[in-house]
Amino acid sequence: MESTSPLEQQGNHMEESAKIGILVEELQNELERLKDRRNSLRIAKEHRDENPYFKKGTRHLAEFFYSKGFLIVDYGKDVGEHYQLGKQIYACLDVSWDFVSRLLASKEQEFRYEAGDISNEAFVNLHNLCIQMQKKDMLEFCLDDRAFFITSKLKGEHRKFLSGECYEAANRYLIEKAIRDFSKDIGFSVYRNVLLKRADSDDDKKNDVQLDFVVEFDDRFYIFETKAGMRMAIDKWVDRTRLFADEKNKFITCCLQDFDPKTFEPFILLPMKSLESDFRNLLEQEFQASRH
């Protein structure tokens, strides 16, 4: 048996000591991670106990989001002040899209909007839309034959609504209609503009996630995001799907663009043009599958 020299023995000891040092450091790091995790869970539980939404009729909703690592900060149960106007804008989208875009983009308070090349039906729809927007104090207008003379009175809240919230209102209408067409007996609740914060966050004034709509059924939740612009924001809805979707609960992105929903499978993206029928079909598939 070959003997090792004192120098070699010293080298072996140093190598073993280095390995032990690495293991000790890894164990210490793991203990720190476990300590941080335990602390986060403690904070989350304290916040859960203080959160009012676990003590109301929203307990089921609060439990769902807590299971995903979030607490409810706030939500809107009503349909919103401009719900009917949002439905109207979407109903005449062929003419309202261009008009609203022009209204938002105009740098002048007063401008002329020519409507001579649109159909009579579209002209009537645009006229009715202007009447309703005038009632909401968003604009004033007068007509000269087929031209609209517009005086913009848009405020910040109006711009926010016309830039996207109006399509959320239309979305809600289509979603609720699809549910009622699917079943007159099914119970559900709709929550608008749901604000969430991470359960272990100590910042009471900050929300980490905003959700357009959450539909609550007895045993599942469907979360809806509305994309009114041309940018798909793929990273956002992929992240949200991973956060909230599972076998029963779904995250659904509704877009103004027209496309084949199968393009984005397994993620659920539905064009608003066919949202009502697409969502009704999804309900039929999901609820039928749960019965077997």
PLM features per residue range, with description:
Residues 1-2:
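N-terminal nucleotide-handling cores and adjacent loading/scaffold lobes of large enzymes
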Residues 6, 15-292:
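Intrinsically disordered, low-complexity Ser/Thr/Pro/Gly-rich regulatory segments
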